Regions:
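N-terminal cap/lid segment of alpha/beta-hydrolase-fold proteins
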Residues: 1-27
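Conserved hydrolase catalytic core segment
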Residues: 156-163
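Structural recognition of the beta-strand scaffold that forms the well-ordered cores
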Residues: 27-30, 81-83, 140, 163-167, ...
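Cap/lid segment of the alpha/beta-hydrolase catalytic domain
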Residues: 23-24, 29-125, 129, 170-180
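Alpha/beta-hydrolase fold nucleophile elbow
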Residues: 133-145
Length: 303
């Protein structure tokens, strides 16, 4: 799938649709972080063994492509899933990551990499809502690392979300996670709490988020309590390095099962699937080339 979020700037990604489902279906947006090759992540056999030996993953298929594992199971649970590219990753290559909006003129005009990605996410919501089978009242988003940052940003910018799941949210380590004036006098915990009372789950890892259960979650619960929504905020620490592995995904499956009313038997377990090789995931090929009007950062800035 690809569509223009701005004239000459295209959002690309894969659309997963469940089979044999009637009626209106929930939709889940899946932004991703700085994984090697982005949407096309394809781990080596040695990396797969490491993931399984550490307990982070159970199956070679999910270890090979944990991003596909997430999308495949959500589709099996009855969700329409849009797994879309961050700017400069996957098929979105006209603007190099993380360049493009670091010049003085862009900053003075509050044009930023993060702003463009967030606009892409808003337009991704528009896209899934244009699908006739999607239930407009059951739209969710989930991502890890800078995909978690993008998840928070979308929840702040768009009120159409019914549930939010953040895994290892970043304070900001790249221009795609920082915009001018974004965190002046505040932080990610406070920003994430602004989506209350929308249901929100947070998975923390053995990284800069490892103390979230004691520093972050209590404060977010206090905000949710003001709305009488204590049962809509969850947080859990998993003792693994920065990731969106099986354990974080299982928390997410259960969270969406509850708040999107999927009706899936608990506990939700991943089922075997065959990951699709990167070449087949690509939106563009000889028969379907990149649109001729696709522009770079300068073109987006001019617009």
């Amino acid at each position: 799938v690809f569509f223009a979020s701005l004239p000459g700037h295209y959002v690309s990604g894969n659309l997963y649709r469940p089979k044999g489902r009637a009626g209106k279906l929930p939709a889940v947006l899946c932004p991703y972080g700085h994984w090697p090759d982005g949407r096309f992540i394809w781990r080596t056999d040695a990396e797969i063994r490491g993931e399984i030996d550490s307990g982070a993953e159970k199956t070679p298929q999910a270890a090979r492509s944990p991003l596909q594992a997430r999308c495949a199971l959500l589709a099996r649970m009855g969700c329409v899933v849009f797994h879309y590219d961050m700017v400069g990753y996957g098929d979105s290559r006209k603007i190099e990551h993380p360049l493009g909006f670091t010049d003085t003129e862009s900053v003075l005009r509050l044009q930023s990499f993060m702003g463009l990605q967030t606009w892409n996410s808003i337009r991704a919501v528009d896209f899934v809502l244009s699908l006739p089978e999607v239930d407009e009242k059951r739209i969710a988003v989930t991502g890890a690392s800078s995909g978690g940052t993008q998840t928070i940003a979308l929840s702040l910018a768009d009120q159409r979300l019914a549930a939010v799941m953040v895994s290892m949210n970043m304070q900001g380590g790249c221009v795609c996670e920082n915009a001018p004036l974004y965190r002046v006098g505040t932080n990610n915990v406070e920003l994430a709490a602004l989506c209350a009372p929308t249901p929100q789950g947070v998975a923390a890892a053995k990284d800069w988020t490892e103390d979230f259960e004691t520093r972050g979650l209590p404060q977010m619960k206090a905000i949710y309590r003001l709305y009488g929504a204590d049962d809509r905020i969850e947080g859990r620490f998993f003792p693994y390095p920065h990731n969106y592995n099986l354990h974080s995904r299982q928390m997410m499956y259960g969270f969406f099962n509850k708040h999107l009313k999927l009706g899936w038997p608990e506990p939700v377990e991943e089922k075997p699937f065959e990951p699709i090789p990167p070449a087949q995931l690509s939106v563009y090929d000889a028969a379907h080339p990149v649109p001729s009007d696709a522009t770079d950062a300068a073109g987006v800035r001019r617009w």
